[in-house]
Amino acid sequence: MGFLITTLIFVVVGIIASLCVRICCNRGPSTNLLHLTLVITATVCCWMMWAIVYIAQMNPLIVPILSETE
């Protein structure tokens, strides 16, 4: 899977999680804002971690060295 497809998956999961929080934890406007902020922040942090690892594998800093005995 490519970078854009997985990014879209994270966006869809974030939207679904936000809707679930709005439906399941409906206690007032300020609590809803806090819950939505936490869900969006968690989704963005997970996406950033995945993106950094994915991009780091595209251009590794250390090139694998093959031994001649193998």
From Swiss-Prot:
Q: Which family does it belong to?
A: Belongs to the V-ATPase e1/e2 subunit family.
Protein name as it appears in the record: V-type proton ATPase subunit e1
Origin organism of this chain? Arabidopsis thaliana
Keyword annotations for this protein, in alphabetical order, are: Golgi apparatus, Hydrogen ion transport, Ion transport, Membrane, Transmembrane, Transmembrane helix, Transport
One cellular component (GO) term of this entry: vacuole
Q: Where does the UniProt annotation locate this protein?
A: Golgi apparatus, trans-Golgi network membrane
> Which molecular function term from Gene Ontology is one that the record holds?
proton-transporting ATPase activity, rotational mechanism
Q: What does this protein do?
A: Subunit of the integral membrane V0 complex of vacuolar ATPase. V-ATPase is responsible for acidifying a variety of intracellular compartments in eukaryotic cells.
Q: Which InterPro entries match?
A: ATPase_V0-cplx_e1/e2_su (IPR008389)
| A UniProt-annotated Pfam family | ATP_synt_H
**Topology of the protein relative to the lipid bilayer:** Multi-pass membrane protein
According to the UniProt entry, the coiled-coil residues are none
Upper classification of the source organism reads:
Eukaryota, Viridiplantae, Streptophyta, Embryophyta, Tracheophyta
Query: Subunit composition?
Result: V-ATPase is a heteromultimeric enzyme composed of a peripheral catalytic V1 complex (components A to H) attached to an integral membrane V0 proton pore complex (components: a, c, c'', d and e).
| Record gene name | VHA-e1
Q: Which residues cross the membrane?
A: 1-21, 36-56
